[in-house]
Curated annotation (Swiss-Prot):
<feature type="active site" description="Proton donor">
    <location>
        <position position="291"/>
    </location>
</feature>
<keyword id="KW-0456">Lyase</keyword>
<dbReference type="InterPro" id="IPR023677">
    <property type="entry name" value="UbiD_bacteria"/>
</dbReference>
<feature type="binding site">
    <location>
        <begin position="179"/>
        <end position="181"/>
    </location>
    <ligand>
        <name>prenylated FMN</name>
    </ligand>
</feature>
<dbReference type="InterPro" id="IPR049381">
    <property type="entry name" value="UbiD-like_C"/>
</dbReference>
<keyword id="KW-1003">Cell membrane</keyword>
<keyword id="KW-0288">FMN</keyword>
<dbReference type="InterPro" id="IPR048304">
    <property type="entry name" value="UbiD_Rift_dom"/>
</dbReference>
<keyword id="KW-0472">Membrane</keyword>
<dbReference type="InterPro" id="IPR002830">
    <property type="entry name" value="UbiD"/>
</dbReference>
<keyword id="KW-0831">Ubiquinone biosynthesis</keyword>
<keyword id="KW-0479">Metal-binding</keyword>
<dbReference type="GO" id="GO:0005829">
    <property type="term" value="C:cytosol"/>
</dbReference>
<dbReference type="GO" id="GO:0006744">
    <property type="term" value="P:ubiquinone biosynthetic process"/>
</dbReference>
<keyword id="KW-0210">Decarboxylase</keyword>
<comment type="similarity">
    <text>Belongs to the UbiD family.</text>
</comment>
<comment type="subunit">
    <text>Homohexamer.</text>
</comment>
Length: 491
């Protein structure tokens, strides 16, 4: 099923009993995090807190949480029937990322519908948009009226967590969508914590270099249709906008509205939109905050967004989440999006059989890759390829490469391969001074650290001078005989 806005998705989840309305008053200060964490760990439903309260004050906005708390709900949001169907989306992205010339007339004809569909999914602008039914400007702008979560006891302040941030570089037609957390530091001011390599930060840096004294327009969308939200966290090719990709997922063009104070465009049916500007040299110290690592992160300086106006629908819904020690919602998103990554990597490296990001590894810090090994050094080539091919894996610290007889998603098999097919000195690749997530306090320098590759494949001549072990396998005839006897054995 496809969803035109967040409310249609909520209605479908409720119909399938995958969403629970919480009528009991609950505070966004810590309580929602604890409830959401327990429900997510139990594989429970999305939550709609209908009576957010704090210190006796009742907010006018219900809070939607744990929306993508299971891989199945992520698949639903992307218009797929199940998680494995996400590989079809990955195959589409792999083709769009590196289209191949048709092998003949039939191949060209077969590819034509996809190309026509992509071209027809350019977003369209509408003049009247529900997201601008209500407008707060000037003194009316007050983030304190929104039930913004304060997630952990040691957090510095309330934190906007599901803000879909819209930016545009000075020489680009394409808008960038990214999800960056935002610390509230005033009634109309938030700190925009975007990492240096992310699209929003790159757009801002490029703009500031060309316009050192000009305020930079930014819009933040809080709550919109699931295809647009998930498009912002999917490895969309640079030739395709996230809005266009969302239309492809949804099967209909994304309807956009121009912001009231800039030429940026936002989803017309968004719940809440923050419009503002980043002024030159306006920076602030962000954090500390509990993060997806399970620890509080260090403080660092980031640009401040001054909010000029807040627009919204009638009876808007505030969409929120928390991050913490896995599993959390980003980890669950990683489990689902893992299936999108597999075909993209396989197109570049056909020898890859499977690729797995264990959620315990904070979604991206460790990858297990199985390959059909063909030559000495093959595992190392795959490691280097995974680190460099997609931006999403530039912060992956550990890559383990195994043979195709090992299930990458079974730790028992992976550990068996590591302990029987690896020599710690010969088969460990260490690289220093590589880009690392600045939240990784284990790195010696903020933003710069090491990577480790583990070659847990069977070794070939040229990689070892010893006779390699032969796996123990039971005789097929004996197995068939025992199968036939099994019911008589009483076991």
């Amino acid at each position: 099923m496809k969803y035109a806005d967040l409310r249609e998705f909520i209605a479908q989840l409720e119909q399938k009993q995958l969403l629970k309305r919480i009528k009991t008053p609950v505070s966004p200060h810590l309580e929602m995090t604890e409830i959401g964490d327990r429900v997510l760990k139990a594989g429970g439903p999305a939550l709609l807190f209908e009576q957010p309260v704090d210190n006796g004050r009742r907010y006018d906005f219900p809070v939607l949480a744990n929306l993508f708390g299971t891989p199945e709900r992520v698949a639903m949001g992307m218009g797929a029937d199940d998680v494995m169907q996400l590989r079809e989306i990955g195959r589409t992205l792999a083709y769009l990322k590196e289209p191949e010339p048709p092998k003949g007339l039939k191949d060209a004809w077969d590819k034509l519908p996809l190309l026509k569909q992509v071209l027809s999914m350019a977003p369209k602008e509408v003049k009247k948009a529900p997201c601008q039914d209500i407008v707060w400007e000037g003194e009316a702008v007050d983030l304190g009226k929104l039930p913004i979560q304060h997630c952990w006891p040691g957090d510095a302040a309330p934190l906007i967590t599901w803000g879909l941030t819209v930016t545009r570089g000075p020489n680009k037609k394409r808008q960038n969508l990214g999800i960056y957390r935002q610390q509230v530091i005033g009634k109309n001011r938030v700190i925009m914590r975007w990492l240096a390599h992310r699209g929003g930060a790159l757009d801002y840096r490029e703009f500031r270099q060309q316009n050192p004294d000009t305020p930079y327009p930014v819009a933040v969308v809080l709550g919109c249709d699931p295809a647009t939200i998930l498009g912002a966290v999917t490895p969309v090719p640079d030739t395709l906008s996230e809005y266009q990709f969302a239309g492809l997922l949804r099967g209909s063009r994304t309807e956009l509205a121009q912001c009231l104070g800039s030429d940026l465009q936002v989803p017309a049916r968004a719940e809440i939109v923050l419009e503002g500007h980043i002024h030159p040299n306006d920076m602030a110290l962000e954090g500390p905050y509990g993060d997806h690592t399970g620890y509080y992160n260090e403080q660092d300086s980031f640009p401040v967004l001054t909010i000029d106006r807040i627009t919204m629908r009638e009876n808007p819904i505030y969409h929120s989440t928390y991050t913490g020690k896995p599993p959390d919602e980003p980890a669950i998103l990683g489990v689902a999006l893992n299936e999108v990554f597999v075909p993209i990597l396989q197109k570049q490296f056909p020898e890859i059989v499977d690729f797995y990001l264990p959620p315990e590894g904070c979604s991206y810090r460790m990858a297990i890759v199985s390959i059909k090994k063909q030559y000495p050094g093959h595992a190392k080539r795959v490691m280097m390829g995974c680190w460099s091919f997609l931006r999403q894996f530039m912060y992956t610290k550990f890559i383990v490469v195994v043979d195709d007889d090992v299930n990458t998603r079974d730790w028992k098999e992976v550990i068996w391969a590591i302990t029987t097919r690896m020599d710690p000195v010969r088969d460990t690749t260490l690289i220093d001074h590589t880009p690392i997530d600045y939240l990784d306090f284990a790195s010696p320098i903020s933003g710069l650290g090491g990577k480790m590759g583990l070659d847990a494949t069977n070794k070939m001549p040229g990689e070892t001078s010893r006779e390699w072990g032969t796996p123990i396998v039971m005789d097929d005839a004996v197995k068939a005989r025992v199968d036939a006897l099994w019911s008589e054995l009483g076991l």
